């Protein structure tokens, strides 16, 4: 059905989160609550997507705009309540257009709200011919939620907020999810005369349903998946919801042919892609747009952030950010790959190696205790332990180039900018300050001095 507008309510503080940032900017599986709801709603292709802000308004508005530049920002005034939020939104939206069709309203603190559930809600609303439809769910513990009160025939009479409910109403387990569909014109009429005569002194959007009943049927659609409409009020709820969601994500990948040895300690964000026969060992965090190839092995205790791991590569006990690791490469343990690296097929970055903006050729090995930054290394080169590319002069970063088939001795220091040609051998402890031609050897003249019988001053 035609969706004239979608209004996302993001004005609240979320005091129970006990946070210095608005609740809607907290994250689940790598995305803020607000962005997750915006994704689901935008997929419905509304004519207008609006976000209502108030607490830390500019911060929330900027987060919304940076995620979707086409969003309309509505600032709620100091009059509290969800009803007032929708009044402000409708006043702004109807200044531009005469809304004609359906208006979807959704809270922004349901991070798992999905497009499929919203599609079903819209279809039910249209098929039923309702003037307004509320999305509901059944909870074992409905504490904190508005209760759906029906008559003996199952028709929706009203929604009663927790603080305004009597004992019989508190026993109701069907609750309001704070997602609604209204006929646009009916909504405009229903919110025009909202009053704040309730325990909270707020303008409740739920009161608009009672007003709407005079001009059109009010229905309720129960969400098929309660998890999709579960709200977050505090960090305890957030942790529980994140765990439940992550369990589903892990189960999805296991059914796709991925081995996850311990789903309870493996965390996988939504944008991660994993090929079949990959193996994920315990204690792994897979984040951002990470891609893991066929038969690759990750872990244990590894964090991948926006990394690409090609087939048959092995990454153990390491942190990898925005790095491409080639086929059958071997990373770790305790390797730190910062953004911008490209490691070739069969390459190695071993224990206590750090890399940044390094291009490592096929078969090249940096086995241990080294820093390689702003550098190009050719193919089948071996870097001795304790080697450093000194790339920073205090103001600018400089580049190091080391060719193919180079043997670098232990404890070398390359003072960039410097280029070492193909087939070079460097002596242990060398400090390489100047370019080295191909097929040569370079070493530093470090004279060893021995002082016999020497003792420190305090022992003399």
UniProtKB/Swiss-Prot annotation:
Annotated GO biological process: cell morphogenesis; cell wall organization; lipid A biosynthetic process; peptidoglycan biosynthetic process; regulation of cell shape; UDP-N-acetylglucosamine biosynthetic process
Gene that encodes it: glmU
Protein name, entry field: Bifunctional protein GlmU
Cited function: Catalyzes the last two sequential reactions in the de novo biosynthetic pathway for UDP-N-acetylglucosamine (UDP-GlcNAc). The C-terminal domain catalyzes the transfer of acetyl group from acetyl coenzyme A to glucosamine-1-phosphate (GlcN-1-P) to produce N-acetylglucosamine-1-phosphate (GlcNAc-1-P), which is converted into UDP-GlcNAc by the transfer of uridine 5-monophosphate (from uridine 5-triphosphate), a reaction catalyzed by the N-terminal domain.
Classification of source organism: Bacteria, Bacillati, Actinomycetota, Actinomycetes, Bifidobacteriales
Family the entry assigns: In the N-terminal section; belongs to the N-acetylglucosamine-1-phosphate uridyltransferase family.
Region feature Linker, mapped onto this chain: 236-256
Gene Ontology annotations for the cellular component aspect, listed alphabetically: cytoplasm; membrane
Organism (species): Bifidobacterium adolescentis (strain ATCC 15703 / DSM 20083 / NCTC 11814 / E194a)
NCBIfam families tied to this protein: glmU, PRK14352.1
Top enzyme class: transferase
Enzyme active site: 368
Reactions the enzyme catalyzes: alpha-D-glucosamine 1-phosphate + acetyl-CoA = N-acetyl-alpha-D-glucosamine 1-phosphate + CoA + H(+); N-acetyl-alpha-D-glucosamine 1-phosphate + UTP + H(+) = UDP-N-acetyl-alpha-D-glucosamine + diphosphate
Annotated spans, N-acetyltransferase: 257-460
Subunit structure, as described in the record: Homotrimer.
Pathway: Nucleotide-sugar biosynthesis; UDP-N-acetyl-alpha-D-glucosamine biosynthesis; N-acetyl-alpha-D-glucosamine 1-phosphate from alpha-D-glucosamine 6-phosphate (route II): step 2/2; Nucleotide-sugar biosynthesis; UDP-N-acetyl-alpha-D-glucosamine biosynthesis; UDP-N-acetyl-alpha-D-glucosamine from N-acetyl-alpha-D-glucosamine 1-phosphate: step 1/1; Bacterial outer membrane biogenesis; LPS lipid A biosynthesis
Annotated residues for binding of Mg(2+): 109, 233
Cofactor names: Mg(2+)
EC code(s) of this entry: 2.7.7.23, 2.3.1.157
Residues at which UDP-N-acetyl-alpha-D-glucosamine binds: 9-12, 23, 76, 81-82, 146, 161, 176, 233, 338, 356, 371, 382
Gene Ontology molecular-function annotations: glucosamine-1-phosphate N-acetyltransferase activity; magnesium ion binding; UDP-N-acetylglucosamine diphosphorylase activity
Sequence segments annotated as region (Pyrophosphorylase): 1-235
Domain of life: Bacteria
């Amino acid at each position: 059905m035609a969706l004239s507008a979608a209004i996302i309510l993001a004005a609240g503080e979320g005091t129970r989160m006990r946070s210095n940032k608005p609740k809607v900017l907290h994250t689940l599986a790598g995305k803020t609550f607000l962005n997750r709801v915006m994704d689901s709603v935008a997929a419905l292709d509304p004519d207008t997507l609006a976000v209502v802000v108030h607490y830390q308004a500019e911060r929330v508005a900027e987060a919304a705009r940076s995620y979707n530049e086409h969003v309309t920002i509505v600032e709620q005034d100091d009059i509290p309540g969800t009803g007032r939020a929708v009044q402000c939104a409708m006043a702004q939206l109807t200044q531009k257009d005469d809304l004609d069709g359906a208006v979807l309203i959704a809270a922004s603190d349901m991070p798992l709200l999905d497009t499929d559930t919203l599609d079903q809600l819209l279809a039910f609303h249209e098929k039923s011919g309702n003037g307004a439809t509320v999305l509901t769910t059944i909870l074992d513990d409905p504490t904190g939620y508005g209760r759906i009160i029906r008559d003996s025939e199952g028709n929706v009479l009203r929604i009663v907020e927790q603080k305004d409910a009597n004992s019989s109403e508190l026993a109701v387990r069907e609750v309001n999810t704070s997602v609604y569909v209204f006929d646009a014109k009916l909504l405009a009429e229903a919110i025009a005369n909202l009053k704040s005569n309730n325990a909270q002194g707020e303008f409740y959007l739920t009161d608009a349903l009672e007003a709407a009943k005079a001009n059109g049927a009010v229905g309720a659609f129960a969400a098929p998946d309660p998890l999709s409409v579960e709200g977050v009020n505090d960090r305890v709820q957030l942790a529980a919801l994140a765990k439940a969601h992550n369990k589903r994500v892990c189960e999805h990948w296991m059914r796709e042919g991925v081995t996850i040895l311990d789903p309870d300690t493996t965390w996988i964000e939504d944008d991660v892609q994993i090929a079949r026969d990959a193996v994920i060992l315990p204690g792994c965090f897979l984040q951002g747009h990470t891609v893991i190839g066929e038969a690759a092995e990750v872990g244990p205790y590894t964090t991948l952030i926006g990394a690409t791991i090609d087939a048959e590569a092995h990454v153990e006990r390491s942190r990898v950010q925005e790095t491409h690791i080639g086929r059958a490469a071997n990373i770790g343990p305790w390797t730190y790959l910062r953004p911008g690296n490209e490691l070739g097929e069969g390459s190695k970055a071993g224990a206590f190696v750090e890399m940044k903006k390094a291009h490592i050729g096929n078969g090249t090995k940096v086995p241990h205790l080294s820093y390689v930054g702003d550098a190009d290394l050719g193919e089948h080169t071996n870097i001795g332990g304790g080697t450093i590319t000194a790339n920073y002069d205090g103001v600018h970063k400089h580049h190091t180039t080391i060719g193919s088939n180079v043997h670098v001795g232990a404890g070398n220091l390359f003072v960039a900018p410097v280029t070492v040609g193909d087939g070079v051998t460097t002596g242990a402890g060398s400090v390489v300050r100047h370019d080295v031609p191909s097929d040569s050897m370079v070493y530093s003249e470090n004279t060893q001095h021995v002082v016999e019988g020497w003792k420190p001053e305090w022992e003399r």
